[in-house]
Structures are given as structure tokens and as C-alpha cells.
Design a protein with these regions (language model features):
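Conserved GNAT-fold acetyl-CoA-binding loop/helix
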Residues: 28-49
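A short helix-loop-beta-strand connector motif used in the catalytic cores of GNAT acetyltransferases and
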Residues: 50-62, 72
Length: 176
């Protein structure tokens, strides 16, 4: 578990699966910029059975508050095999909890953890240009804007440009 001031990041437990699948399939509550694809329940369960949503180059942690309520999740994954980077994906499940700094704390905890435990030089965020909340989050967490990837993301029936942000290992854990 990774503990912050107001949240804890913890692995997914078997007892979380029903709730987690309900959030996974609630497309209307995902927010405007979260991918719309869903897995079947057997495929979702199989993925959990294989590795508990935690592997060498990918993983998911739940975001838990002090009342032990699940607020959302954060994931990391290897982008492509020839780049020395991970990408983060995240979601706050309840619209009432959005905009309260939960994800800023979660991203900071995850970035610190990944750079302390993985031999990876950079972590990136891919953000829709209209997603002002995620752009602010990236900047608050020290990510640098690198530019626009034109037509790189397909969602809701069309291709979208995305903004690329990154943070480097030495930005977080300077070498002496």
C-alpha cells in the first residue's frame, strides 16, 4: 500500500471485483475523456485471476479514502517495448469527488513509487486537449508538456488529437 495525506493506493482484492466491474461498465460515469471500451465480465475476471491486475510492466491500484471507501483507480502500463517509459491512466468514480485533489495525490504517489522501484526513465500522460482538469493535474505534478499527437486517440466514433506530458526520473529523484 502507498499512503498519502488523504488517500491510500492499494492493490485490488478479490472482494473488490463486483464493485470494480460495475464501475468499469458504467460508461456514462466515466467522464468525457475516459475510453469507452469495456471487457466482458469473464474476460475482466480472467485478467484479475492471471495477476491480480499487477504485473511487471502494468498494474492497477485502487484509491481509498480514510473511511475505506473506493474513490477511483490509477494504472500504469508500458507504452511500447522500445521506449523507456510508462503511461498512467486514472479515474475518479464519483463526480462529487472530482476536483478535490484526490488524483493529484494519487499521481504523485504512483510516480514516486514507480521511479523508486522500476528501471524506467519517464512516465507520460496522454490528455485530450479539452480536458482542463487533467492538464492542470499534469502541471501540478511536475509533468512537462511535450506537444500534440495529431489524431492519435480513437474514442466515441472519431480520432482525436491528444496532448503529451512527461516527467523524468531525474525530475523526481535527482542523481547526485
Amino acid at each position: 500500500m502507498l499512503s498519502g495525506q488523504s488517500i491510500t493506493l492499494r492493490p485490488v482484492h478479490a472482494s473488490d471485483m463486483e464493485m470494480l466491474y460495475d464501475f468499469h461498465t458504467d460508461i456514462q460515469n466515466r467522464g468525457e475523456y475516459f475510453p469507452r471500451g469495456i471487457l466482458s465480465e469473464p474476460a475482466f475476471q480472467k485478467q484479475f485471476q492471471e495477476n491480480g491486475f499487477w504485473g511487471k510492466d502494468d498494474g492497477m491500484l485502487l484509491i481509498i479514502n480514510s473511511a475505506n471507501e473506493t474513490l477511483g483507480h490509477i494504472e500504469f502500463f508500458k507504452t511500447v517495448n522500445y521506449l523507456d517509459e510508462y503511461e498512467l491512466s486514472y479515474q475518479v468514480y464519483s463526480t462529487e469527488q472530482r476536483g478535490k485533489g484526490i488524483m493529484t495525490e494519487a499521481v504523485n504517489l504512483m510516480v514516486q513509487y514507480l521511479f523508486e522501484t522500476k528501471r524506467m526513465n519517464r512516465i507520460r500522460l496522454i490528455i485530450h486537449p479539452d480536458n482542463a482538469a487533467s492538464r492542470r493535474l499534469a502541471e501540478k505534478c511536475g509533468f512537462q508538456h511535450e506537444g500534440t499527437a495529431r489524431g492519435a486517440w480513437y474514442n466515441k466514433g472519431r480520432h482525436h488529437d491528444v496532448e503529451v506530458y512527461s516527467i523524468l526520473h531525474d525530475d523526481v529523484i535527482p542523481t547526485s
